[in-house]
């Protein structure tokens, strides 16, 4: 007892000295201390461990970080193992746990060594919670002493801790085993984690386990991979000296951190936890008492339809352009989507037959609305009424490809169930904006018009959004994701459109508050998934729908709250915006991992507005850059956006005069004698030469020699995922030399179980190896490791181990790929180690240009030698020097899909370098790429 008292006094003194700290949570953790009270007296670890050293360290951390920011936990087996336990019946261990003020402990199997009744006696003296969720202790003396979980307040956050224990049936007395029923840890953890995260609003969910990291019947690694909503696993039982945080991806593709701290208390584990932000939801709750969001739509930052002077100021010379476009639609015939067009999706996978007429109707609606706002004479009103009447009486606004989420599982709309998708949300926003501007005019014709429009938006958008039973079909909310689903661009896209409908049309304050609260919680899910580095893993082609739609949502909420709900000063939001500029190569080419296209045209107003909001000169200059006209060697004046997005059409007017003024200044520089290229290049001087996105694991390297290389790590369950861990693309002077094909036109196979039968999704059609005959596998469990980057003035490098992206059948222990860019030389080195050899390795490279293998003669007359390959594309000539033991070959992929041919032409070529089937189990493949 003297030792316990000594520790208690030490702790008390240190607590008095502690100071509050504004940092995230520190989890101090021990496990399997096994009654090792004193430092080790001999053996392999003399002098190490002991509770006095532990207490001193724990108290030093509590002082440094603030006790309220530190959580001390024990992952089981605190008893049994030395004479302290046998002579004092485990009482001193309980005294020590109390004295050191542990926050929570879980049970280990050795806690049962002296029987259940004896364990109950000891636990009755423990002044802290004991957790174990996968056993039922009802009817035993442990009933009431052990909880399945506990919620702690730490670092100003709610932390849920779930306890889990290994199957003890084979390691405890038979009589004890018969009393206890073991339940699957993953099933139990999944249930409680959902309850803690979703229902109880915990900011962090920790599984405190005594399962074992490795070598046990069910491990922490298996637990992480089989659950959702668990953030951290603090484990014990296997005595694993895990000297770093292991990262395992869960069913949602989210990383779960696993830690375990060896044995005997030789060290104290220290884990720093960064809480997920709840950025928007927290702000909304702060503003809720003030009722800053009004019901009357007066917040909308555009003049009323009747305010002709206001519209003249907004539009200026753009009015004529809008009116002229509207005239073209005065005789437009509103298109009907027949039932068979919906059914065509499930019959053949064809979606355009349904989408094209709906898209045409949406463009017509936008064009007519903008024309009437510009002219203000009523000329377009009847045609608007016809369109809105037609759309309001449609059975659904959802696209046929998304209707199988109905309970029927069919692509024909079921009027008994309303979902919200990209199509319905966007059309709902259009209808809401039109109603906002013209409802008084409609009422003069017949009040029934406004009533029908309001009822349609309520039925199609407002009611389904508030119906919590629809969380699963409306998966994009992020509240109930299926295994493997991730939060992607649907989230901000749908939420922006839906919240615009509510803020313009909802007349019930309680319903509006519910929608605002739900949208803030939902969009937080997207911000968390995007990661703090700001990269868009879906690629630049989706930036406008991902970060761009997040901007729309934030701008709507900012305007509707009179600037109170604002996040444009948050670094992550700015970084997400600048990603679009930094992923740009030249001449419309962009970095195009995943489903993104390699060539894009941009919407300058979206980029400019976003940049203006976050204070990014880089983005505003990039917007102006995209107004350049290389044929005329000048810059085009910005035009209002006429498309099928009502909000963005209006937003394109927000800074149109400011953009116009800047374009005039650029053209004046050209008129004054500065070259067009000089003016154009001046708009890209703020772009950094090298960019590293550490969480998403994207790396961009560009140099003064005109080389731009992009490479990636990550995992194979990213949004719009391709199996492409470790791939790269290379451009020289804006010419694509090593490419990523992208994706063809979407069909029902694109987002189905057949996705990875599509050639462009597979790793063997990326710039990647086939290892020992095996391709990369899809899923969050297949990921990169040990990623390192270095940027120097003379050269840049990225290194990563991609072996984890391949099935175990590859027998690959490690495959470390190294990219080294030095001037006009890119060296790719693959260093590998296999357990066994079953097939050849194949190194693949995908190119657009012509390929010349050894024995060929280039058009310039160069005879290609052994160990060389020449690639020529649009005047750029490159030499690949490869290991001579590899056999080169070419396969041409003929292209017919317009989405691919519009970028690449009629074909791409894959260069494959194949090893012997008896190649060594370890070795190195080096490829040196130079201009030729």
Describe each model-derived feature in a short phrase:
Residues 326-337, 384-402, 449-477, 514-534, ...:
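Long, well-ordered core segments of solenoidal/helical folds
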Residues 410-539, 552, 654:
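Active-site lining segments of carbohydrate-active enzymes
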Residues 404, 425, 746-932:
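CBM-like, beta-strand-rich accessory domains located in the C-terminal region of large
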Residues 1-24, 276:
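Bacterial Sec-dependent N-terminal signal peptides
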Residues 23-275, 279-282:
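Acidic, metal/ion-coordinating pockets
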Residues 548-737, 792, 904, 918:
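Carbohydrate-active enzyme catalytic cores, enriched for enzymes
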Residues 299, 349-361, 408-424, 470-492, ...:
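Solvent-exposed loop and edge beta-strand segments that line ligand/cofactor-binding
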Residues 372-385, 434-458, 502-520, 557-573, ...:
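Structural helix-adjacent loops and short alpha-helical linkers that scaffold large soluble proteins
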């Amino acid at each position: 007892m003297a030792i316990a008292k000594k520790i208690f006094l030490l702790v008390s003194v240190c607590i008095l000295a502690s100071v509050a700290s504004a940092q995230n949570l520190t989890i101090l953790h021990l496990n399997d201390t096994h009654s090792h009270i004193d430092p080790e007296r001999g053996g392999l670890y003399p002098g190490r461990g002991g509770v006095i050293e532990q207490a001193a360290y724990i108290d030093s951390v509590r002082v440094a970080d603030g006790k309220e920011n530190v959580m001390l936990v024990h992952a089981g087996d605190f008893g049994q193992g030395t004479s302290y336990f046998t002579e004092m019946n485990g009482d001193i261990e309980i005294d020590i746990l109390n004295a050191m003020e542990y926050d929570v402990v879980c049970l280990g199997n050795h806690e049962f060594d002296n029987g259940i009744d004896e364990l109950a006696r000891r636990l009755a003296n423990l002044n802290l919670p004991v957790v174990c969720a996968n056993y039922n202790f009802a009817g035993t003396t442990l009933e009431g002493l052990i909880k399945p979980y506990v919620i702690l307040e730490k670092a100003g956050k709610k932390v849920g801790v779930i306890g889990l224990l290994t199957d003890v049936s084979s390691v405890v007395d038979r009589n004890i085993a018969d009393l206890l029923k073991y339940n699957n840890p993953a099933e139990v953890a999944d249930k409680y984690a959902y309850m803690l995260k979703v229902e109880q609003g915990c900011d962090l969910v920790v599984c405190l386990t005594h399962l074992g990291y490795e070598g046990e019947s069910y491990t922490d690694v298996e637990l992480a991979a089989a659950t959702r909503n668990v953030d951290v696993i603090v484990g014990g039982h296997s005595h694993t000296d895990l000297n770093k945080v292991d990262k395992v991806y869960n069913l949602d593709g989210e990383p779960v951190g696993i830690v375990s701290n060896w044995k005997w208390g030789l060290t104290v584990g220290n884990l720093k936890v960064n809480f997920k932000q709840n950025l928007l939801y927290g702000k909304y709750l702060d503003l809720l008492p003030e009722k800053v969001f009004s019901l009357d739509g007066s917040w909308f930052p555009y003049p009323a339809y009747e305010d002709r002077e206001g519209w003249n100021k907004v539009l200026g010379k753009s009015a004529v352009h809008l009116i002229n476009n509207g005239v073209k639609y005065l005789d437009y015939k509103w298109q009907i989507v027949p039932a068979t067009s919906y059914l065509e999706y499930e019959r053949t996978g064809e979606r355009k037959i349904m989408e094209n007429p709906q898209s045409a109707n949406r463009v017509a609606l936008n064009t007519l609305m903008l024309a009437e706002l510009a002219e203000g004479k009523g000329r377009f009103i009847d045609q608007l009424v016809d369109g809105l009447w037609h759309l309001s009486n449609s059975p659904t606004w959802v696209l046929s490809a998304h209707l199988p989420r109905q309970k029927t599982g069919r692509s024909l709309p079921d009027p008994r169930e309303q979902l919200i998708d990209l199509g319905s949300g966007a059309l709902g926003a259009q209808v809401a904006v039109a109603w906002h501007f013209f409802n008084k005019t409609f009422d003069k014709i017949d009040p029934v018009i406004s009533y029908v429009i309001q009822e349609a938006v309520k039925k199609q958008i407002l009611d389904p959004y508030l119906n919590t039973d629809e969380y699963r079909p409306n998966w994009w909310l992020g509240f109930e994701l299926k295994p493997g689903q991730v939060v992607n661009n649907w989230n901000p896209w749908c939420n922006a459109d839906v919240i615009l409908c509510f803020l313009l049309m909802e007349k019930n304050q309680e319903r509006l508050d519910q929608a605002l609260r739900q949208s803030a919680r939902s969009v937080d899910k997207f911000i968390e998934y995007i990661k703090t580095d700001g990269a868009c893993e879906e690629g630049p082609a989706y930036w406008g729908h991902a970060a761009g739609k997040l901007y729309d949502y934030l701008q709507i909420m900012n305007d509707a709250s009179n600037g109170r709900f604002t996040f444009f000063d948050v670094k992550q939001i700015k970084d997400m915006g600048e990603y679009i500029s930094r992923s740009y190569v030249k001449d419309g080419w962009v970095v195009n991992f995943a489903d993104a296209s390699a060539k894009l045209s941009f919407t300058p107003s979206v980029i400019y507005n976003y940049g203006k909001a976050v204070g990014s000169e880089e983005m505003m200059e990039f917007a102006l850059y995209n107004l350049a006209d290389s044929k005329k060697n000048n810059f085009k004046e910005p035009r209002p956006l006429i498309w099928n997005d009502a909000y963005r059409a209006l937003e394109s007017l927000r800074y149109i005069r400011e953009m116009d003024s800047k374009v005039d200044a650029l053209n004046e520089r050209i008129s004054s004698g500065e070259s067009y290229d000089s003016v154009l290049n001046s708009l890209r001087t703020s772009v950094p030469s090298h960019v590293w996105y550490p969480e998403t694991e994207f790396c961009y390297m560009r140099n003064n020699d005109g080389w731009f290389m992009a490479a990636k790590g990550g995992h194979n369950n990213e949004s719009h995922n391709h199996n492409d861990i470790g791939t790269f693309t290379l451009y020289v002077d804006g010419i694509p030399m090593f490419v990523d094909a992208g994706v063809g036109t979407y069909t029902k196979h694109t987002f189905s179980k057949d996705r990875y039968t599509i050639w462009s999704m597979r790793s063997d059609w990326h710039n990647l190896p086939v290892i020992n005959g095996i391709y990369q596998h899809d899923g969050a469990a297949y990921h990169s490791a040990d990623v390192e980057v270095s940027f120097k003035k003379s050269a840049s490098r990225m290194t990563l181990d991609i072996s984890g992206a391949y099935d175990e059948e590859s027998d690959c222990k490690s495959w470390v790929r190294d990219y080294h860019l030095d001037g006009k030389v890119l060296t790719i080195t693959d260093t590998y180690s296999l357990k066994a050899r079953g097939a050849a390795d194949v190194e693949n490279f995908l190119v657009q240009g012509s390929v010349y293998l050894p024995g060929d003669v280039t058009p310039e007359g160069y005879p290609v030698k052994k160990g060389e390959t020449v690639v020529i594309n649009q005047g750029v000539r490159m030499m690949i020097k490869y290991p001579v033991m590899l056999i080169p070959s070419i396969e041409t992929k003929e292209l017919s899909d317009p989405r691919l041919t519009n970028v690449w032409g009629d074909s791409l070529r894959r260069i494959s370098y194949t090893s012997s089937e008896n190649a060594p189990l370890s070795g190195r493949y080096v490829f040196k790429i130079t201009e030729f």
